[in-house]
A protein has these predicted regions:
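Anionic coordination/interaction segments
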Residues: 1-314
């Protein structure tokens, strides 16, 4: 079968994967004797990752959905990449791997502890590669996401990119709370450390129906940087990216505003389900590429993330 093959690295390659019969699988979650494992559930839809978290589905970073629902929701609530492409002939906003760009030439490559996606848009002269793998041997759990955009056109390209997650579940809410009291639990949700460029997502305090309220110090973190190690601007308020488009079908605010203007907007960090996007602007000549590195994971406290940030960017 020409659409199913193994590449030179021994990875199983599925071409045009989103149009195939749906399937679901997991990354191995091996973190080594001193690491902290992360469970990562993926499907052959959208940008593949359907949900992930620590320990079990009651500690999600991306909300857990069973396979039958993940096939439907992953293109919207999974990882998303929005590219604003400006050439001499005009400006367009393009989302690789989306269900409405089915004409793109796409493939999924499945390795032992990695998953890579590729989309080539002949119409826009763009190639997008996304590589996922879990981080072993660290005092925190982490999913690495590497996004590379290549200008396949024969003219220079001015690129603005937003990449990340439309919904990040702060630490402290279980699966039942998300499913049965999702709106109520938003009252406890908060994002800390935004001013330092590494959002830290957790509940402000325990939300259990008990007489005692306990402190929550652990949380989920998200950081991203470019090829030089420079940290990227984070967006945690979905209204800044999507506006009032609660269906998450398109980044309405990013479509109409420059990235620099979005960076200046005030972001609400409490009382709503946050997102996790990072933005960058580049000028790519013909054949040139740019890469963004992201790390999403769980840590015992915010001080641990601050200590490790500089090392991780190297």
């Amino acid at each position: 079968m020409k659409d199913l093959a193994f590449d030179e690295r021994g990875r199983f390659v599925i071409r045009d994967y989103a149009s195939r019969r749906p399937f679901a699988s997991l990354l191995p979650g091996i973190a080594g004797p001193l690491g902290i494992p992360l469970w990562v559930f993926y499907v052959n839809r959208g940008q593949a990752i359907a949900s992930f978290g620590v320990e079990n589905k009651d500690n999600p970073i991306m909300e857990f959905e069973p396979a039958n629902r993940a096939y439907q929701t992953t293109p919207y609530t999974g990882f998303r990449t929005f590219l604003k492409l400006k050439r001499e002939e005009g400006t367009v906003v393009y989302e690789p791997f989306s269900a409405w760009h089915s004409a793109d030439d796409s493939q999924m490559s499945i390795g032992m502890n990695e998953l890579e996606l590729q989309a080539i848009s002949a119409a826009h002269g763009i190639q997008t590669n996304i590589l996922y793998f879990t981080l072993p041997g660290e005092p925190f759990s982490g999913l690495v996401r590497q996004v590379t955009v290549t200008n396949l056109g024969d003219t220079p390209l001015t690129l603005e990119m937003l990449d990340g997650m439309p919904r990040v579940m702060p630490y402290g809410v279980d699966n039942r709370g998300l499913k049965e009291m999702g709106r109520t639990t938003e009252a406890w949700m908060a994002v800390f450390n935004l001013d330092e460029g590494v959002p830290f997502y957790r509940f402000q305090a325990s939300a259990d129906d008990t007489t005692e309220v306990s402190e929550i110090r652990a949380g989920h973190f998200y950081l991203a940087f470019d090829e030089s190690g420079q940290g990227l601007a984070p967006f945690v308020d979905p209204v800044v990216v999507f506006g009032q488009n609660t269906a998450l079908s398109a980044p309405d605010e990013f479509v109409v505003q420059p990235l620099a203007d979005l960076c200046q907007q005030r972001q609400v960090t409490t009382g709503r389900t946050p997102c996790g996007f990072f933005g960058t602007s580049q000028v790519l000549g013909p054949g040139e590429s740019t890469t963004v590195y992201g790390l999403i994971g769980h840590a015992g406290n915010i001080e641990q993330v601050r200590r490790e940030r500089a090392r991780l960017a190297q």
